[in-house]
Amino acid sequence: MTQHLNAVALVVPDYDQAIEYYCGVLGFNLIEDTTLTPQKRWVLIRPRGSNGTSILLAQASNDAERQCIGNQTGGRVFLFLQTDDFDGDYQKYSDNGVNFIETPRNELYGKVCKFRDCFGNSWDLLERSKSV
């Protein structure tokens, strides 16, 4: 039996605002945007060059969901965006106004820097070291 993780849900306040940020600012690809009901869409995005796990943008539909926006992991890093060009992506994201909350650092596992998306979620931008 073979399994893989297809998508991870990310609760957002507005579909179009989220698409604009993740695709416009971070350069992700919009994989699918299908209207299911007048209030609900199936919106999948994925980092450019990736054919792996997608992010399902899930628009908050009640107060409990709205309270979780930007804090789905209780303040911990939620998503780890791996790149093969850390310096290039860091510069591009900085130029695009991404909110980096620390300076890049080298760890045993690679080069990493934490940022917050426009909704407050913590991400790591990461380039793995060749030895790991």
Question: Regions from the language model: what does each represent?
Answer:
Residues 1-7, 29-82, 88-116, 126-132:
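Vicinal oxygen chelate
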Residues 12-15, 36-38:
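Conserved beta-strand-loop-alpha-helix junction that forms the acyl-donor binding cleft
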Residues 14, 117-120:
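Conserved phosphate-binding and hydrolysis motifs of nucleotide-dependent enzymes
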Residues 14-15, 84-86:
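Helix N-cap motif at beta-to-alpha junctions
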Residues 18-23, 93, 120:
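Conserved active-site tyrosine of GNAT-family acetyltransferases
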